[in-house]
Design a protein with these regions (language model features):
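Bacterial Sec-dependent N-terminal signal peptides
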Residues: 1-25, 232
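Gram-negative/organellar outer-membrane beta-barrel architecture
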Residues: 26-36, 41-179, 339, 345-363
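Sequence/structural signature of outer-membrane beta-barrel proteins
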Residues: 58-62, 76-82, 109-113, 158-162, ...
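Extracellular loop and loop/strand-boundary signature of outer-membrane beta-barrel proteins
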Residues: 75-76, 122-127, 168-174, 211-216, ...
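Short loop/turn motifs that connect adjacent beta-strands in outer-membrane beta-barrel proteins
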Residues: 22-33, 61-70, 96-101, 147-148, ...
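Transmembrane beta-strands of outer-membrane beta-barrel proteins
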Residues: 35-37, 71-75, 101-104, 151-153, ...
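C-terminal outer-membrane beta-barrel translocator/porin domains of Gram-negative envelope proteins
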Residues: 188, 194-293, 299-302
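Outer-membrane beta-barrel "beta-signal"
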Residues: 184-187, 325-330, 335, 350-363
Length: 363
């Protein structure tokens, strides 16, 4: 159960640490470093009111390096009406004319969430509460190996303690203490004109993670994560209209514990916030229309489909989960093209309202 919260937290962490970065697929412009302090307020059905803040600084490691995007270091924290909290520090460095990309993040959290359990004797199920306390460290290094292709190792160290609302849910005790350490590699093909807010190009990412006892993990399985993002500029005159497409799959294989499953929601398919749909494999398709309609103001409209299954062959007979919605944007830090905004999405029997920093489809 704790993996659902951990995945949501790692997703948020991943989105934050890439803010404001730009690839060198097109001729770069010199930009001044910038400091951003962005407050956050949000609401969803499981956490109630959420408040927080992001403090981040953008800078050049080498002022003579006009090719590397701005490096980024910051802090993020949040607290919710359900007494959940999360805090972490992060850095992402672009080194030696963008030949090296290094990122690191460390954080702690205490999340009160829920999971959905079907009743075999009935046609419906029930939600049950649980609490996860966790500390984590994420490291990643990539080297440019050909054109816009990057390759390198990645590792995560996670220790968590989960307390369930009633005994026996974990299969053993009402409290589960576990380590979900992993090591792997990541391959990226990035031709976008801007990482944070692209108008054209492609971002293809493949990550393979191995959970092993020699890494200190309590579980032995593999995870394969693929995300394909494509961006099209719809206007020849300017960059005010963009169409973004995204396809993902998140597959866990082997002796996958319940904690290793993926929850439907987040940027991959907006409109879901209750944690009802989860499985070993989650596949998504999504499209988003972006329109910068007035100076620093913009809007988005999005629609997508998701499927949560035990194996790929189950997709034809599984429930297809739609998600549609729209959002408003404001360019908070023009020098780094960072937008803030709010997205409202509707899914199957669920909805989500999300305050966001940066655009979707950035990982």
């Amino acid at each position: 159960m704790q993996k659902s919260s951990l995945l949501l937290f790692l997703l948020l962490l991943t989105v934050v640490i890439v803010h404001g970065q730009r690839t060198s697929a097109v001729k770069p412009k010199r930009e001044k470093s910038g400091f951003a302090a962005i407050p956050m307020i949000n609401y969803n059905r499981t956490q109630g009111v959420i408040v927080g803040a992001l403090v981040s600084n953008y800078y050049k490691l080498n002022k003579k390096d006009t090719i590397s995007p701005s490096s980024n270091t910051g802090l993020f924290g949040m607290y919710t009406q359900q007494k959940s909290y999360a805090a972490f520090a992060f850095s992402r460095f672009y080194i030696a004319q963008d030949r090296w990309r290094v990122s690191a993040a460390a954080g702690t959290m205490d999340i009160n969430f829920q999971f959905y359990l079907e009743d075999p004797a009935a046609s419906t199920g029930n939600f049950y509460d649980y609490t996860t306390k966790a500390n984590l460290l994420v490291l990643q290094v990539q080297r440019n190996i050909f054109n816009r292709i990057y390759f390198g190792p990645t590792a995560s160290f996670i220790k968590s303690t989960t307390s369930f609302a009633f005994p026996g849910v974990s299969g053993e005790d009402s409290v589960s203490v576990s380590k979900l350490n992993n090591i792997g590699y990541i391959i990226t093909n990035d031709t976008r004109d801007h990482v944070q807010n692209p108008t054209r190009g492609m971002f293809l990412n493949f990550k393979n993670q191995f959970y092993r006892d020699w890494m200190g993990s309590d579980y032995k399985f593999e995870r394969y994560i693929v995300s394909y993002n494509q961006f099209f500029k719809l206007s020849k005159k300017d960059d005010t209209k963009v169409l973004a497409l995204r396809a993902t799959f998140n597959v866990a294989a082997g002796d996958v514990p319940f904690e290793g499953q993926t929850v439907v929601g987040g940027d991959d398919i907006r409109g879901y916030s209750q944690g009802q749909f989860r499985n070993d494999q989650v596949y998504t398709l999504q499209t988003e229309y972006r329109w910068n309609f007035y100076k620093r103001w913009g809007m988005v409209a999005f629609a997508g489909l998701a499927s949560a299954v035990a194996s790929f062959s189950d997709i034809p007979k599984s429930d297809i989960l739609p998600g549609v919605g729209a959002g408003i944007r404001f360019k908070m830090l023009p020098s780094e093209k960072i937008n803030i905004g709010v997205d409202a999405g509707v899914g199957r029997g669920d909805y989500s309202i999300t305050f966001r920093i940066g655009e979707s489809f950035g990982r």
